[in-house]
Each structure stands twice: as C-alpha cells, then as structure tokens.
C-alpha cells in the first residue's frame, strides 16, 4: 500500500501514477531520482490541465511558463498550492544538474508530500477521486528492500513521453468528469511545518539558488556562507540576547543580510520588526552598515534594502555580490545629472519623458510606464534613459525584453550604435555574452532560462528591466519574469493611455489612465512628428456577408462545388449525395480562399496606393493577411497579375520563413526588394521602416490596441521620400 494508490486503478492515469509511485518509492533511498520523478509527474499533471481546459501549449513552453500563466494560477486559486507547485519544480531542476549533495531525504520527502496534495487537489476538482486521505508518512518505503519498483525511466526518456502521456490522460480524465471545474479547492496539508522545517526546505532552496551554502552547525560563522541561529546581543529583552535564523556573511565575515523566518501558517510580516532589531544589533556589534533585511514565512519573502524603498516582496535572496552592491548604493544621490545627449534624443517631448521617469524614480517608485505613439522614438528614449541612469550610478546592468526576435535584434542594433561604450548581447546570439552590461531577449527565451536546471540569472542580476510594448497579454503569459527579477522596471507602450487596461496600470502601481508620462498620436501629428493616415474603406460582399450558393453565378457555383465535394468526403457522404450550405464570412480566408477577392484588393492597391520615385513605383507596403495560406495566395496572385515586376517584388514574411529576418532587412532597405511584404503577425508591431506608406488590412482587427500598433507601421516621417525636400 502506498499513498499514491488513490489514483492507481483509474483508467488513463497509469503514466502519472507511475511517476508519482517512483517518487514515493525512492524518496528515502534515492532522493535525486525521487525529486526528478516528482517534477515529471507535476509537468504531466499541468499539461493535462491545459489540454482539459483547451489551452494551447507552445512548442517551447517550459514548466515555469505553464505554471506562471495567469489562467493556470487562477485555476489553482491558492497561493499555498502554487508555492508547493514551484517547490516541486525547483527542487526537480536542482536535482537534474546539481551534484553538491543539496537534495537529501528532507527535500525529497517534502517534494513527495507537496506532489500528493497537488495531484490530489486537482483530481478532486475533476471528480476523479471522491476523497483525499491525509498523507501517511508510514507508507513511504525506508529501504530498498521494501520498494516495489525497480525500473526507473531515465529523466530524458520520460521527458520525451510527457506530452504524449498528457494527451492520453486529458482524454481519460475528461471522459470521467461530470463538469469543468472553474478552480481547484486546495486541500489542507496535515504536516504543518515547524519553523526549523520551513528553514530547511523552502528557505534553504531559495538560498541555494542564490549561491549560498547554509552551515549545518548552529551558531557557526563561516566566510561567504549563511550561518544559522546566530547569536546577537543588545536585544530589548531580559537577557539582551537573541538568535537570528540566518545571517549571510561576506568574505571578511561582515554580515551582509539577516533573515527572519516564521512558520508557514504565520504572516511573513510578523517577523519584520524582529529582523530589524537583529540587523541593528549586528551593525553595532560588527561596526558595519546595517545588513539587508529579509523576513519570510517560506511562502512569501520581503526585503528592506536600506536604500530608502518601502519593503517589497521578492522571489528569493540576492547573491553575495548583489548584496554588496545594494549596500554600496545606500549613499547614492538622486538622479540630478540630466544632461541628455542630443545624438540619441533631440526632441523636447523625448527629453521630457526621460526627466519624468527620473523624477519618478527619485521619488522611490520602482516602476515607470511611458505611453508613446508608434514612431515617436520609444527605443531611443529608453537608450537615453539608460545613459542617464548609468552616468548617475543608478544602473549597471540592463535587460531589454520584446516579444519577437526581430524586435530584439532591432533594439540591440540601436543600443550598440548609440551606446558604443557598453557591451551588448542577445540571448538568441550563437556567441551570447551572458556577462554583457545590456542583454536583449524575447520573453519566451528568458522564461526558458529561468526554468533551466542551472539558473542562468540571479534575481538581482539586472538593475533595470525594459519592457517593449507593455500590455496585459505579456504580463498574463510572462508575469513570472517581472515577479522574479528585483530591479527597476520601465514599461513602453504605444497603446493610447485610455486604452491601456487596468491590470497594466496596477502592475506599475498607477491610477487608471495616469502613466508616468505620455505623448500620443494626435499630439505627435499636431507637432509634425508623425503623418496622419487616410483610410480607404472597401468591403467585399463576400467578406462581410459570406457566400450563399443560391446567389452565385454558374461559374462561381462550380468553384464552390469543388469545396463541397471535399466537405462531403470529410463527412463520409457519397459523391452523389445532395449537399449545400451557406459559407459564413468568418470562414473566408481561414478555410475558403477566394481568388477574385484577392485580385480585387491587389488591383486596388496598385491603382490607388501611394507611389514614390516620381509616381513610378508603388511605395513600401505591408499587407496584413489572415494566415500563412492566405498570405501565400496573395503573393501567388500578385505574381500572376504583375509578372513584369519580378519574383521578389511581393514576398511573404511570417514565422514559416526560416530566414525571415533577412527578408525584413531587405524590405527595410529603400533600394532593395521586396516592395510589398505580406505579413502574418510578424510585421504588425515593432518594425521600424519609415518608407512604409501603404497598409492593407486584409483581415478584421478586433483589438484597438493592435490596430494602433499596426497603423504605426506607416505614420513615421521619412525625409526625401517623394524626392529632394519632399518628406
């Protein structure tokens, strides 16, 4: 009998039961195998939830990105259960790469215990099991002789089968469930942790991630290590003595930080004043700056850094070098050297933006949000701000995040050109320099680094994190990045401030509609920094009303019959069976592809679009297509209609093209082809080509935010576009 036998005989749960059973059977005899299998069980469980919920799982999705997604956290609906999920994930990561003996029987027991309540709570939610018994420690084998499992899948082999297993599990669980639960009801964990157990499990894991070795001997002080139960003198009690749960010591045994831990059932804030007293006593005893203060209950950790910021929540602990820098920053002055380089930003509104952010940071705010219309120089403003912050000794290391590699590369080029004295690198570079002062990354790549077995970045690695196009979808999918890194935050968005959603303002600690500063489209047009757009509305009846077979010409009906024959075959009907239906407008170019409509749109573009070079050449154009198949059809029809313009005049640029970055570079060059880019999402945002003068919206746009981003592709100023002196 084992604890995980509660799911042993349930059809479809064989794989997850095996992972769980191995984790339980090897908990005492081989902790490394135990926690690895626990992590695999967790990943299978999470992917099963995604498939049951109908949520898409990205090809490169990591366990961190899946569990940090706001849909999943809302489903789990319990901070306690989420902490247990992340413990199993993290301890499994540690075991996969560490041979330092950190993972022992205590760690594996806690992983198995947490896994039991994670799986049990989710199975209860889907009514796969009726009750969840308390975890029975006595059922866990304490020797190899009592283990019933001898064959252990290798982690890499098991990992490869996880997705396939999750699909099978999702089907089985889905069939056995009466309804889709909105949320999980977390089950109470009977093994309430003592303060010491909290320290050895949650907190020790976080310290280990930050590179700290925890001494085993109470009261022992070792250079560059975390001492436990360190005696302090001068406390306001009868004996004048106290014992700090942890003290993090520098190489010369100067205390850099003190950690006060309370039971997991106690609010972390309960330890704040006690930690402050310990810090004061240590500063007096060692005649040193007051140590950085952490107070935690294992689930939640807060920091008082001594720089002047209010206490704040952090996701772990800082490294020894980060603590040294933090203490050194206490003497820094406000940002007063506001000398802004005209070489980088020479417009008054850009300088105002930089000054607004600096004033905001001087006021002890850690997060700033700028709303700037596309084409007004968001990236340049961020570069100038970095220049100012570095010069004022506020920032040393910077992380720039964007949602596509093309935008990352574009930003990297601009930073390298305008800040030549700072090292830059992209995490997507083959020769990436992890130690570069300014690192560039997509959100997806960074999430992958945070969920690696060996953690690439500590939480204090970056002093400033810049978010390109800060909006709700980014925070919903990749919020774990901004929760993890403990640095100043700068959000950039082209979304009009009244359209920015409340959750984005909440993330930056701001009132609705009140960003740090803004410079919007109408203002930029009035000032002459952007050009107004002229809309030509042209709807096809097919695109707005769909296709009614009874309203077609004989020739059109013949084309539609070919589609109906295909549908009959899929439906298992005989070729001669009668079949007809009305095609909805939403199916056009998603399923039904109409040549006549494509030809009409292309001819309209070539006849009415803005032309350059003395009106002899259609200007740079983006056609926004429904999907890849639609984009290919557009390019093919263009080649048929205008063969004299050559094969490269109109090209598809989307994520199906392996070397899309090269095509974008050619499109951005006024002297090179393509002249027309047919895009599926890739050119909707971020691409900086001032020569673009025509935008064809060949798909419905339901988001105002996305619409304004797309409009911004064609509103930039471009000198001499129509000839010398004609901008």
Regions inferred by a protein language model and the residue ranges of each:
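Conserved C-terminal RecA-like helicase domain
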Residues: 437, 567-573, 578-679
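SF2 helicase catalytic motif II
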Residues: 455-491
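Conserved RecA-like ASCE P-loop NTPase motor core of nucleic-acid helicases/translocases
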Residues: 370, 396-404, 619-627
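Interdomain helical connector at the RecA1-RecA2 junction of SF1/SF2 helicase-like NTPases
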Residues: 502-618
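Amphipathic alpha-helical interface elements
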Residues: 1-156
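Conserved RecA-like P-loop NTPase helicase motor core
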Residues: 291, 464, 650-727
């Amino acid at each position: 009998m084992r604890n995980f036998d509660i799911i042993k005989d349930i059809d479809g749960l064989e794989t997850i039961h095996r992972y769980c059973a191995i984790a339980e059977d090897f908990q005492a005899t081989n902790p490394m195998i135990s926690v690895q299998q626990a992590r695999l069980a967790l990943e299978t469980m999470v992917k099963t939830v995604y498939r049951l919920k109908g949520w898409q799982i990205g090809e490169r999705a990591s366990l961190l990105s899946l569990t940090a997604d706001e849909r999943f956290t809302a489903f789990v609906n319990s901070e306690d259960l989420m902490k247990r999920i992340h413990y199993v994930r993290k301890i499994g990561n540690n075991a996969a790469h560490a041979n330092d003996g950190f993972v022992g029987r205590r760690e594996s027991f806690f992983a198995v215990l947490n896994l039991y309540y994670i799986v049990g709570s989710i199975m209860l939610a889907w009514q796969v099991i009726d009750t969840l018994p308390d975890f029975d420690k006595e059922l866990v084998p304490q020797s190899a002789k009592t283990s019933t499992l001898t064959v252990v899948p290798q982690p890499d082999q098991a990992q490869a089968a996880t997705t396939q297993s999750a699909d099978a599990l999702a089907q089985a669980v889905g069939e056995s469930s009466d309804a889709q639960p909105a949320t999980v009801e977390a089950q109470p964990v009977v093994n309430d942790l003592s303060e010491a157990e909290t320290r050895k499990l949650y907190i020790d894991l976080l310290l280990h991630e930050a590179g700290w070795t925890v001494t085993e001997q109470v009261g022992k002080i070792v250079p560059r290590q975390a001492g436990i139960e360190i005696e302090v003198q001068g406390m306001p009690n009868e004996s004048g003595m106290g014992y700090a749960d942890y003290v993090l010591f520098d190489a010369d045994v100067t205390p850099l930080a003190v950690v006060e831990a309370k039971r997991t059932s106690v609010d972390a804030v309960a330890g704040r004043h006690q930690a402050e007293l310990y810090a004061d006593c240590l500063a007096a005893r060692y005649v040193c700056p007051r140590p950085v203060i952490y107070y935690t209950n294992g689930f939640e950790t807060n920091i008082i850094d001594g720089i002047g910021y209010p206490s704040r929540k952090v996701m772990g602990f800082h490294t020894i070098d980060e603590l040294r820098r933090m203490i050194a920053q206490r003497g820094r002055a406000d940002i007063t050297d506001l000398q802004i380089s005209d070489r980088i930003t020479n417009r008054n509104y850009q300088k105002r933006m930089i000054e607004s952010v600096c004033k905001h940071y001087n006021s002890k705010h850690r997060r700033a949000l700028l709303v700037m219309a596309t084409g007004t120089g968001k990236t340049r403003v961020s570069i100038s701000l970095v220049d100012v912050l570095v010069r004022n000794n506020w920032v040393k290391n910077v992380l720039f995040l964007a949602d596509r590699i093309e935008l990352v590369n574009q930003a990297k080029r601009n930073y390298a050109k305008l800040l030549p004295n700072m090292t830059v690198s992209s995490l997507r570079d083959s020769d990436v320099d992890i130690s570069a002062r300014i690192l560039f990354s997509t959100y997806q790549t960074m999430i992958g680094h945070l969920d690696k077995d060996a953690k690439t970045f500590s939480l204090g690695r970056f002093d400033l994190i810049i978010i390109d196009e800060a909006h709700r979808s980014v925070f919903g999918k990749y919020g774990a990045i901004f929760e993890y890194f403990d640095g100043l935050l700068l959000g950039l968005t082209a979304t009009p401030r009244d359209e920015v959603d409340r959750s984005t303002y909440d993330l930056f600690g701001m009132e609705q509609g009140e960003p740090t500063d803004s410079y919007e489209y109408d203002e930029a047009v009035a000032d002459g920094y952007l050009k107004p757009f002229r809309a030509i509305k042209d709807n096809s009846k097919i695109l707005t009303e769909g296709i009614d077979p009874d309203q077609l010409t004989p020739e059109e009906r013949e084309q539609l019959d070919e589609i109906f024959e295909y549908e009959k075959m899929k439906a298992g009907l005989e070729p001669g069976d009668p079949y007809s239906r009305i095609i909805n407008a939403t199916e056009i170019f998603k399923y039904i592809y109409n040549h006549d409509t494509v030809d009409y749109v292309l001819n309209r573009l070539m006849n009415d679009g803005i032309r350059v070079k003395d009106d002899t050449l259609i200007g740079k154009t983006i056609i926004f297509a429904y999907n890849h198949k639609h984009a290919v059809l557009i390019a093919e029809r263009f080649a048929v209609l205008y063969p004299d313009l050559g094969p490269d005049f109109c090209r598809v640029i989307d994520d199906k093209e392996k070397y899309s970055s090269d095509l974008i570079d050619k499109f951005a060059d006024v002297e090179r082809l393509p002249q027309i880019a047919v895009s599926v999402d890739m050119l909707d945002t971020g691409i900086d080509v001032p020569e673009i003068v025509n935008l064809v919206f060949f798909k419905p746009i339901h988001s105002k935010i996305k619409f304004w981003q797309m409009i911004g592709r064609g509103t930039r100023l471009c000198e001499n576009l129509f000839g010398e002196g004609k901008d």
